[in-house]
């Protein structure tokens, strides 16, 4: 009977574990690439250090309601996933604690929510938290992310557009409503004149 070789067995175990780890890392890289594709090339990276788990969970839920997603990941895997984009020249984004914000519908709305959260959480120090990202697969600086957050959201733009479109209709309705009212007032005045004249 062959003797059990503990070292050879341990080596095989380590090799299998290493292969599982590599496969898991590749799955994560692929999932980040897929998220970027689903978000039409939009992602914003931010430093989440100092944010407790509960507020971060609440932010994630708010972002999810806006059809977005926050992913916390390893910088090396983020870089590997986005190295074939405009972020390849901005490796400094992937230093320190990093989370990625994806938007699957309205990038402005999710960016507004993130900036609002960072302002509430970090007060004056919030600006250094935004690292930059991609908009339509083009690099955007932290300053451009802040500018994006100041734009009106898709819902706000639709409301303004409807307001502009409805203004002439509302004005026409008011004018049409005013004509019979004025006619009634004129007829009442004539009736009063006749009744005064008849007395």
Curated annotation (Swiss-Prot):
Domain of life: Bacteria
rRNA-binding as UniProt keyword: yes
CC annotations in GO: large ribosomal subunit
Keywords: Ribonucleoprotein, Ribosomal protein, RNA-binding, rRNA-binding
Example GO biological process: translation
Pfam families: Ribosomal_L10
GO terms, molecular function: large ribosomal subunit rRNA binding; structural constituent of ribosome
Cystine connections: none
This protein's record includes keyword rRNA-binding: yes
PANTHER family in the cross-refs: 39S RIBOSOMAL PROTEIN L10, MITOCHONDRIAL
UniProt function note: Forms part of the ribosomal stalk, playing a central role in the interaction of the ribosome with GTP-bound translation factors.
Family: Belongs to the universal ribosomal protein uL10 family.
UniProt subunit comment: Part of the ribosomal stalk of the 50S ribosomal subunit. The N-terminus interacts with L11 and the large rRNA to form the base of the stalk. The C-terminus forms an elongated spine to which L12 dimers bind in a sequential fashion forming a multimeric L10(L12)X complex.
Identification of the protein by name: Large ribosomal subunit protein uL10
């Amino acid at each position: 009977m062959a003797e059990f070789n503990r070292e050879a067995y341990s080596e095989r175990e380590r090799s299998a574990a290493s292969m599982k780890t590599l496969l898991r890392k590749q799955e994560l890289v692929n999932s980040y690439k897929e998220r970027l594709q689903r978000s039409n090339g939009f992602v914003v990276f931010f430093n989440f250090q100092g944010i407790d788990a509960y507020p971060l969970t609440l932010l994630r839920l708010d972002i999810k309601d806006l059809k977005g997603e926050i992913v916390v990941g390893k910088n090396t895997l983020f870089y590997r996933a986005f190295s074939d984009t405009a972020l390849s020249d901005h490796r400094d984004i992937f230093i320190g604690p990093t989370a990625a914000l994806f938007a699957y519908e309205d990038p402005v709305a999710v960016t507004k929510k993130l900036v609002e959260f960072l302002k509430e959480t970090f007060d004056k120090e919030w600006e250094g938290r935004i690292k930059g990202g991609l908009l339509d697969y083009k690099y955007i600086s932290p300053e451009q992310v802040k500018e994006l957050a100041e734009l009106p959201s898709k819902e706000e733009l639709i409301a303004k557009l409807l307001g502009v479109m409805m203004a002439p209709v509302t004005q026409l309705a008011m004018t049409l409503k005013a004509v019979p009212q004025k006619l009634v007032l004129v007829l009442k005045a004539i009736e009063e004149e006749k009744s005064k004249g008849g007395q």
